[in-house]
């Protein structure tokens, strides 16, 4: 079906009401990101009668995730006394939108600021919306910074500050839907390049800042809420979780989350992958590929996407293409070829386009889909591998604690 687009002049997204913007330090618990059972317990704890909690949870779930409210006064079918009780104890506010950049190709990048937690400081992350023919994809971050230091990735130069919470992951989706007019009875802003009909956000990918599987429980919780049929209702087939290769959590992700899997591969032998993706030293290719072969539900209808950044003179030879085919033999897969997106201080060059096409032809002739990802948002540093915020670094001991917890399960 043909999709038309809106090319009206650009205007920056603003928070709808100033009292919906998060302050520097939050004093109230947010209802965003709680499971339905957790929400029921939270309501009981503030005095909502137990016999009412299931009904109240259903009401709140609908208003938060279907209607997209960010102010308790907008909830029309809950009495004023209970709304006041909710306001006194909880928050459903959005994070602060520090900035919005809009690429010439329609890609949008938001810089979001979340309030301080415990003794920390407010942190900032980036979220990207990519409009395409017939769909809109939102790229979500799972951590502030990253611990993996992949040599071709800008995020890897920002050492990990902390994990995001389920609330903060879902808030990225809610803010984007606010800004795009993707909730009922909302208006799409001037300048938004989006499909005129249907949802503005049809797909989400966990491919922003951070390694999702180093924040497993939180990412799991957020994605299960995002895919809940009574709320945001995104199909699990339209949710993709990308990992650089945290092997112990790959099969578990398939069993407990059940979304589509993408693997940041980028090399066909350990020597090179150790340099490009240092987690390979801990989980080498043999272990990674074995985990992929055992991903639950793997089939031609549920293929794994292998991401392969094209680096000139590094990993782009036709011999590399042939070795890639052998490496993935027998795995239902799609291979996304990603032209390298430069960033300040990067030491790599993108492969020549003709070489990328030759590489793609070799892979395609072996029976694998090998689309070349068209760079989107390069001019605003919103393309793959270009995300970074200026938040404070986590102490080394904190980073090691996160890695140790995963590696010793």
Swiss-Prot record:
GO terms for biological process: rRNA base methylation; tRNA methylation. The lineage of its organism: Bacteria, Pseudomonadati, Pseudomonadota, Alphaproteobacteria, Hyphomicrobiales. GO terms for molecular function: 4 iron, 4 sulfur cluster binding; metal ion binding; rRNA (adenine(2503)-C2-)-methyltransferase activity; rRNA binding; tRNA (adenine(37)-C2)-methyltransferase activity; tRNA binding. This is Dual-specificity RNA methyltransferase RlmN. It comes from the Bacteria. Disulfide bonds join 139-384. GO terms for cellular component: cytoplasm. [4Fe-4S] cluster binds at residues 146, 150, 153. Belongs to the radical SAM superfamily. RlmN family. The active site is at residues 126, 384. Reaction proceeds by a ping-pong mechanism involving intermediate methylation of a conserved cysteine residue. Keywords: 4Fe-4S, Cytoplasm, Disulfide bond, Iron, Iron-sulfur, Metal-binding, Methyltransferase, rRNA processing, S-adenosyl-L-methionine, Transferase, tRNA processing. Signal peptide: none annotated. The gene is rlmN. S-adenosyl-L-methionine binds at residues 210-211, 242, 264-266, 341. CDD domains: Radical_SAM. NCBIfam families: rRNA_mod_RlmN.
């Amino acid at each position: 079906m043909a999709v038309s687009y809106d090319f009206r002049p650009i205007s920056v997204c603003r928070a709808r009401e100033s009292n919906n913007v998060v302050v520097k330090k939050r004093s109230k618990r947010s209802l965003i990101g709680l499971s339905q059972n957790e929400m029921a317990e939270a309501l009981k704890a503030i005095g909502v009668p137990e016999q009412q909690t299931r009904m109240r949870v259903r009401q709140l779930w609908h208003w938060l995730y279907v209607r997209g409210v960010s102010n308790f006064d907008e909830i029309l079918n809950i009495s004023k006394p209970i709304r006041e009780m909710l306001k006194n104890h909880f928050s459903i506010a959005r994070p602060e939108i520090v900035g919005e950049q809009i690429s010439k190709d329609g890609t949008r990048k938001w810089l979001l600021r979340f309030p301080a937690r415990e003794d920390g400081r407010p942190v900032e992350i980036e979220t990207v919306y990519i409009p395409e023919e017939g769909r809109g994809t939102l790229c979500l971050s799972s951590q502030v910074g990253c611990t993996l230091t992949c040599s071709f990735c800008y995020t890897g130069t920002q050492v990990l500050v902390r994990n995001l919470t389920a609330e903060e992951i879902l808030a990225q989706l809610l803010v984007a839907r606010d800004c795009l007019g993707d909730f009922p009875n909302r208006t799409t802003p001037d300048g938004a390049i989006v499909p005129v009909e249907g949802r503005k956000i049809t797909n989400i990918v966990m491919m922003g800042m951070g390694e999702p599987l180093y924040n497993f429980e939180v990412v799991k919780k957020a994605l299960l809420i995002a895919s809940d049929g009574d709320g945001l209702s995104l199909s699990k087939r339209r949710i993709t979780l990308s990992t650089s290769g945290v092997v112990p959590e790959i099969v578990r992700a398939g069993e407990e989350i059940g979304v589509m899997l993408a693997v940041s591969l980028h090399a066909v032998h350990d020597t090179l992958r150790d340099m490009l993706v240092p987690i390979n030293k801990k989980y080498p290719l043999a272990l990674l590929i074995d985990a992929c072969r055992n991903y639950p539900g793997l089939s031609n209808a549920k293929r794994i996407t292998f991401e392969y950044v094209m680096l000139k003179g590094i990993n782009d030879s036709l011999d590399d293409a042939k070795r890639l085919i052998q490496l993935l033999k027998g795995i239902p897969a799609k291979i996304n070829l990603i032209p390298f997106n430069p960033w300040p201080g990067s030491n790599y060059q993108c492969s020549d386009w003709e070489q990328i096409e030759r590489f793609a032809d070799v892979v395609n002739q072996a029976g694998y889909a090998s689309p070349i990802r068209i760079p989107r948002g390069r001019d605003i540093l919103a393309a793959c591998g270009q995300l970074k915020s200026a938040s404070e670094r986590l102490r080394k001991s904190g980073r090691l604690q996160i890695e140790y917890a995963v590696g010793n399960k």
